[in-house]
Structures are given as structure tokens and as C-alpha cells.
Amino acid sequence: MAERKKLLITGAAGLVGSALRKYLRGRYDFRLLFHNNIPEVESEDEIVVSDTADFEQMVEAAAGVDAIAHLGIAVSKRGYPRSRYNRMVIETDINGTYNIFEAARINGVKTVIYASSNAITGRYETDGLLSTPEVTPRPRDFYGVGKAFGEALGRHYHDLFGLSVYCIRICNFPNTDEVNTKYEPGMNRWLSARDMAELAACCLEAKHPQFGIIYGVSQGSESKFDISNSLELVGWQPRDRGADPA
């Protein structure tokens, strides 16, 4: 039996991290990075308590892993003044993301999955236009600006150092596989936990080093997001579907 790959998950207590821990358990060995909220985990999981803003600790956390799923993000902006939240984005989504990519390079990590966001192309959505992986970023807020930096950094590390980098533009992710039968705003941007985990697995198992941007969204979003490249890049198609408008 082939030895299982070791996967470092940053932001492992978050919604996406929790979904990966649930659906990818048994397929990968986990090293889980938590900031301060540590949930109940399995005994075989490796635990790291740290902050992605600490470069030396990120280099240490990435030692000996095959891949990294970088899911750590700035907390919700609700309740924070704009200037303070923007500084949080710089610290987490810009400085922290640089630390992860550089730690991957230093340790010879082969693959990085970067939790990006449809916020990068949010202005296209506002204008009723189709968002594609190729269009020029038009972030709807400073969070989207931070994510655009991460994608550009991932492209740089692929081109210069040969890392496989997959930027998943995660859309509406409540970490559930259950869809209300009644349509609600945001359901046409919905990504199921199952689809998210399977997309991550497809990225981890892709055979050749490459850079890719993929919209993480389940079926029913065709008028907003172009996900046609996901099948060619990593062999992924969503299985689940959000509720349709009446």
C-alpha cells in the first residue's frame, strides 16, 4: 500500500478546514494548524498552534509535508472599522500567505491549495457579468484585494520555483451538503462541503505541476461563474446543486 500524503491545513478550525478534515480523513495524514480555536480532533492528527504571520513557525510547520491547504483568512469584517480590518487583511491574507508560499519553497513542498474567493471578481457579479478565471480582477472589497495578491503570489511561485498551485475561488460556503428546497439569496453561489473536499482532493492528486484558478461553486451557478476549466485542469466537476429560483 502506498504511503499516504501528509497534508498541512492552515485555518483547520474554519468552515473549509472542517469540511476537509471530515471528507478527506483516511485519504491523507493531517497536520492541523490552529490559531486559538482548537476543536476536538482525532488522536492521529498532528496539531500545531501558531499564527501564519510568524514566518519561522510556518517554516517549521511545513517541514515534512507533501502539500499545504492554506485556508487561514482574516476574520469577518463585521464590527471592525475599515482601517483596522484592512490591516488585518494585510497581516493575514498578504503577509501570512507569503509566509506559507515561502515555507513551501524552503521545504520542497510540491503542492499548495490556496483558498481564494469570488470576492476577487465581485464587481463583475455586481454588474451582472460572467466571472471567469481569465478576467482582470475587480475586487468588491479589500478582502478581495488581499486574495488577488495571494493568487499573483501563487503564480509567481509556480513560474519561478515549479510549485503546483491551485487557487480555489470559494463562493458561498456554509459547510453543509443540505440545500433548502426554497431558493434563498446566495444559493446560486453555493458550494457544498462534499464538492469542496473533492475539488481539493483532485488538486492534490493532479499529476503534473501547474497553476490554476478554479471557481469553487456547485451546480446552478452557470450564469455567474465559468467553471469549465476545472475538468481539464484537475478532473473535477461539482456533484451537488443549489436551489434554483422559483
Residues covered by each model-derived region:
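N-terminal Rossmann NAD(P)H-binding glycine-rich loop of SDR-like oxidoreductase domains
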Residues: L7-R27
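NAD(P)H-binding glycine-rich loop region in Rossmannoid oxidoreductase-like domains
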Residues: I38-P39, D45, V49-T92
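Glycine-rich NAD(P)-binding loop of the Rossmann-fold in SDR/ketoreductase-type enzymes
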Residues: A53, M88-N99, V145-G146, L191
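Catalytic helix-loop patch of NAD(P)-dependent Rossmann-fold dehydrogenases
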Residues: R87, E91, G128-V165
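Conserved catalytic Lys-bearing alpha helix of Rossmann-like short-chain dehydrogenase/reductases
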Residues: I94-I100, V109, G146-G154, M196
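Conserved Rossmann-fold NAD(P)-dependent oxidoreductase catalytic core, especially the SDR/UDP-sugar
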Residues: N99-R138
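Alpha-helical substrate-binding/gating segment
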Residues: I170-D177, W190-F211, Q219
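Conserved C-terminal active-site "lid" loop/helix of NAD(P)H-dependent oxidoreductases
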Residues: G212-I214, Q219-Q237
